[in-house]
């Protein structure tokens, strides 16, 4: 046990480990309540979302959409010489992305400075209980210098990291962390994994001009989403030109003489690719935290175990975000950070303490077409054992009547038959995430199908389909 005032360099009310969305939000809110707060981060501020996740992914998704838009413009009368067709400047895209990420890194750093949070650059590890009921944290800077600190409360918000390939030659594969900054654009890309990250990357890089093959060991991609939506989006991806191989996996990866990768699949195929992206899931980032020193328990998947108040089994130590494995979404980590700050240091004057509510959390998948979803899937609703009604519509968006694109849209409502409440809303099509965000408010307020029906739609839009669905597809 280290004694404060001897080997410890400083003490705080709250010590946050991790400068991602959840950690920064908790630190800022706590500091605004008058707490003495420190935050340790060994890399760039902003965490996965800002640096190698949500933000660069969405920027590249925008970029991918332009190639399709250029082609569709011909259907609306736009003409240009074929020789002058737009070409992707990969270096320019990377540079623009890097500039925006650097700006956001600065924004996060500025938020900490303005709030009076002490930012410590380096890797943090737990030291265990200290005198006076405090917890100890050691920070090792890049130059090897170490400092020790104590805090009444310690928050672990270190997020997650991509799972690496474990097949022979797996070291030749890359993860989503490296995907946005490849030295050269991969003209041939093999994506391993059919989750949302794999499907997003396959769609994005296909849109940017790559020849993409997606390999997934399951029967259908996007496990966990509504089955009908999964089938629909997989079909749309294949129609666009992404090759999707299900019930198939990688046996080994070899290096070719020209720098290419030779990938042997379990079905006997050999695929040559310029890059092999492994997107087979993410795992909690707890390496080097020295959790055992503070008796912080983890589950079988390595996620830190917490109760409904984000408390670990170790007194004074809390965890939020991807490292606890509840819902790996940036807005969830932000909400958890605010709820914890209220819990530990009280809410803002005149405001009630925030409470976490994990019901009806909307989410999106930025495939082409994108997905927006909130509430129960049809499968979840049926498994609950209550009678339901399913409303759906699949159609060709107005834009594509002239564009010549074969892209279609799907909208779907799940309704509890007894209460008439809309318990699930799903969409795949243009602007699906933007549309779903608004309807998520309605579901959170307990909107009924009758209330949807009584709402006049905006015409002509895709969103109006949700308030004009009348025919029950299944019950």
Predicted regions and their residues:
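Glycine-rich flavin
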Residues: 2-12, 28-35, 40-185, 218-222, ...
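Beta1/beta-strand and adjacent pyrophosphate-binding region of the FAD-binding site
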Residues: 7-20, 185-195
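Short hydrophobic core segments
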Residues: 15-17, 124, 148-159, 191-192, ...
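Flexible, glycine-rich terminal cap/loop adjacent to redox cofactors
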Residues: 17-22, 26-43, 48, 55, ...
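Catalytic nucleophile loop
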Residues: 23, 195-198, 333
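A structural signal for isolated positions on well-ordered beta-strands in alpha/beta enzyme cores
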Residues: 38, 190, 213-214, 357, ...
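Glycine-rich dinucleotide-binding loop and its adjacent helix/turn
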Residues: 54, 153-214, 292-294, 298-313
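FAD-site-proximal beta/loop scaffold in flavoenzymes
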Residues: 170-187, 270-350
């Amino acid at each position: 046990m280290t004694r404060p005032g001897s080997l410890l360099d400083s003490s705080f009310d709250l010590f946050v480990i991790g400068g991602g969305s959840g950690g920064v939000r908790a630190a800022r809110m706590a500091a605004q309540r008058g707490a003495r707060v420190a935050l340790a981060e060994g890399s760039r501020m902003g965490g996965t979302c800002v640096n190698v996740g949500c933000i660069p992914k969405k920027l590249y998704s925008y970029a991918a959409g332009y190639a399709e838009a250029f082609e569709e413009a011909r259907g609306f009368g736009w003409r240009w010489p074929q020789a002058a067709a737009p070409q992707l400047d990969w270096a320019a895209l990377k540079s623009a992305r890097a500039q925006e990420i650097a700006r956001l890194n600065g924004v996060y750093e500025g938020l900490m400075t303005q709030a009076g949070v002490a930012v410590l650059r380096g890797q943090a590890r737990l030291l265990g209980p200290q005198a006076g009921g405090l917890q100890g944290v050691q920070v090792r800077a890049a130059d090897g210098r170490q400092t020790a600190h104590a805090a009444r409360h310690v928050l672990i918000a270190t997020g997650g990291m991509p799972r690496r390939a474990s097949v022979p030659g797996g070291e030749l594969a890359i993860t989503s962390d490296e995907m946005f900054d490849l030295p050269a654009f991969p003209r041939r890309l093999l994506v391993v994994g059919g989750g949302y990250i794999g499907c997003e990357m396959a769609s994005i890089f296909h849109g940017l001009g790559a020849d993409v093959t997606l390999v997934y060991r399951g029967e259908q991609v996007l496990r966990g989403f509504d089955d009908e939506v999964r089938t629909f989006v997989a079909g749309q991806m294949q129609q666009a030109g992404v090759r999707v191989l299900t019930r198939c996996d990688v046996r080994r990866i070899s290096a070719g003489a020209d720098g290419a990768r030779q990938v042997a699949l379990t079905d006997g195929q050999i695929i040559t690719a310029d890059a092999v992206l492994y997107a087979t899931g993410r795992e909690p980032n707890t390496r080097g935290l020295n959790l055992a020193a503070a008796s912080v328990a983890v589950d079988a998947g390595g996620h830190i175990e917490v109760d409904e108040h984000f408390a670990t089994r170790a007194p004074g130590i809390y965890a939020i975000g991807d490292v606890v494995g509840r819902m790996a979404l940036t807005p969830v980590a932000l909400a958890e950070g605010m709820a914890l700050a209220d819990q530990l240091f009280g809410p803002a004057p005149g405001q009630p303490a925030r409470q976490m509510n994990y019901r009806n959390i909307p989410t999106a998948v930025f495939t082409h077409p994108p997905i927006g979803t909130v509430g129960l899937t049809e499968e979840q609703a049926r498994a609950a054992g209550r009678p339901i009604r399913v409303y759906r519509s699949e159609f060709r968006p107005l834009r594509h009547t002239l564009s010549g694109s074969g892209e279609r849209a799907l909208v779907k409502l799940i309704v509890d038959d007894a209460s008439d409440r809309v318990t699930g809303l799903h969409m795949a099509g243009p602007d699906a995430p933007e549309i779903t965000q608004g309807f998520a408010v309605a579901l959170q307020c307990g909107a009924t199908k009758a209330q949807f029906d009584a709402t006049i739609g905006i015409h002509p839009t895709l969103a109006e389909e949700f308030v004009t669905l009348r025919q029950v597809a299944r019950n």
